[in-house]
Curated annotation (Swiss-Prot):
Its cofactor is Zn(2+). Binds 1 zinc ion. This is Transcriptional repressor NrdR. The keyword Transport does not apply. A zinc finger (unnamed) spans 3-34. Negatively regulates transcription of bacterial ribonucleotide reductase nrd genes and operons by binding to NrdR-boxes. One of its GO terms (biological process) is negative regulation of DNA-templated transcription.
Amino acid sequence: MQCPFCNHGELKVIDSRNAPEANAIKRRRECLKCSQRFTTFETVELTLQVLKRDGRYENFQESKLIHGLNAASSHTRIGQDQVHAIASNVKSELLGKQNREISTKEIGELVMKYLKKADMIAYIRFACVYRRFKDVGELMEVLLSATPDMEK
């Protein structure tokens, strides 16, 4: 690692802390040449392979997960902090699995689990895209299962 200010390669760590909200270790560093201080975050590299619907494999990309969450939660009470928290929870659950190959179905189900707790509108929006409903009946099944108190 190099100093972002002078590109010198010798640094010392001043402070280290867990940053559980980011699933990371936060380190305060100081350059031994220019004495500038800066913060770095060390995270676990996610090496999951995602099995797509068409049979291809792709590296897991948290940015795609966040994009999907943003689309589903647009104009709802879910803010960016909660979007990132949901993405972090999904990522943590995926990392906790023994298998490093995960299907888009498993990812989608995890996202739906968290969205259902957070906001029903975001949950329904995500379900519409993720489940690719073929007719209104399929959508009605999700609506009725999402609102168990509603009369059928």
